[in-house]
Amino acid sequence: MQKRTIPRRTFLKETLAGTTLLSLSSVLPSELLLADELSQVPKDLVFFSPKEYLIFEAVAERIIGQPSPGQPSTKEVGVASRADQFLAGADAEVQDQLHQLLTVFNSPIVAFLFDFRFSSFLNMSAEDKDSYIRDWMTSMFGVRRTGFQALKRISLSMFYTDSRSWKEIGYEGMFMPEDRK
């Protein structure tokens, strides 16, 4: 395996960007959520706060996209609820990083500083959400690209490990002997 060398300037810029993002996440003002949005959040959350649940649900919906007719949506599959259960068993350090990532991702301050947007992710239009996610995916800062990859992989794995989503991708499930189906 070849050792990857990073120029000092790149290392310093990425370290500074990552430190800034993580520092901001702990002091960002919390938005007030509407009562109807909160009423849709399950009461039995284990990992996510109600706000984080809404953020992750919105991210997963934009990453996975609209289903074909007759196929389940991210809400019907319960992607955010499944992620909540899955992440509850994750390592404490991973949990802390995901809480910070969701806070930073939804922050209007971070959106303004990096993308000149004046809104939190939850308050953006569908088109702006897609563009914002794309900005994270293609960012010059490795910490943002890594954050995007984390959100994408969790979203996709929670959606496509549910058997209701298999038909859309042409997967029929495991081949089992006829008597075990």
Where are these regions (language model features)?
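N-terminal secretory signal peptides and thylakoid transit peptides that target proteins
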Residues: M1-L22
